Amino acid sequence: MSGIILTFCAFGLGALAVFALPPFSMPVLLPVAFGALYLLTVGESRMRAGLAGWAFGVGFFLFGLSWIAESFFVDAERFGWMAVPAVAGLAAGLALFPAAAMAAFAWSRTKGVSGALIFAVCWSVSEWLRGTMLTGFPWNLIAYAWADYDVPRQTAAWVGSYGLGLVTVLLSVLPVTLLMRNRRHNTFAAFV
């Protein structure tokens, strides 16, 4: 897959993942987004996996944090022009965390169920770092997908938001890894 196609696919998957979060609250989209991101990054070089992670992050944060642009329109004459560059810059900067996560996953060269676990751990560590480094920015955590669902949300009391995110990403990627065990199902796995 060419780098341009990889980038656009990953960007679209990141944008799709936003619909799992409130106010849309469609966590059923997470296996599609993360399963496909796993397929885009497994077996790739660190550079290509990092690029896919960055593009996924840009799509995820650009659409997930677009509400920040509203603050620039309080005084639109003076600050309105800053809305698009500010949100785009924030998305591009925050996307460095998923980029690092996917590069670390690619570095592990792990596939199968172990690969799914490493993938989920890399993603969760990147969310934790994003939420704690410098002043922290714990917005748009994957665990927020369960905000409108009582039963899954209650597990956050035991494992926290980052632990719930880890379990969510792991359960999102596992079906694809299990389908990939049998080579003839690879094409089908791409559509899951």
Identify what each model region corresponds to:
Residues M1-V192:
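Membrane-embedded alpha-helical bundles of multi-pass enzymes
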